[in-house]
Amino acid sequence: MDKDAMITYLIGELKKENLELHDLIVPEELEEKQKLLRALFNTRKPMAASTQFLTIQDLYLQVRKGERGIVQLNSLQSIPQDKRIYLWKGDITRLEIDAIVNAANKTLLGCMKPLHNLSLIHISEPTRPISI
């Protein structure tokens, strides 16, 4: 399955589970489809997702990760005051790390906007087992 087919499938499944999206028009251009998919991921309410959906989502995210590249810790420089602390300005989804502190607001919940870069089903679905 190519990237466009994965996006089409994922958008279709997200439309099926939300009646408010029934009449949503899906753009034809790949870049616009990707923006729509990101918005749908970010505004999806927590609920179970099918194994097939999660598998295709994971494949799609691996493709996107490969396109954008991964930044590893050994390519970064710590701050002089504490060698355990690294500051990063850029796309945090590219970092190969265990934890991120992003105190963007007083609730520490981050941004709840549809076009925020990362708020995927992996994060919001309480029933999905976490692999360590």
Residue ranges and their predicted role:
Residues N117-L118:
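Charge-patterned, phosphorylation-rich low-complexity C-terminal interaction regions
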Residues I121-I132:
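Single conserved hydrophobic/aromatic residue that forms the stacking wall/gate
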Residues T55, D98-A99, I121:
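Active-site-proximal helix/loop capping residues that flank conserved catalytic or ligand/cofactor
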Residues K106-T107:
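Short glycine-rich anion-binding loops that position phosphate/pyrophosphate groups of nucleotides
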Residues G110-C111:
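Cytochrome P450 core scaffold surrounding the K-helix E-X-X-R motif
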Residues L59-A103, P114:
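Long amphipathic N-terminal alpha/beta scaffold segment
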Residues M1-S78:
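Non-catalytic accessory regions outside enzyme or core folds
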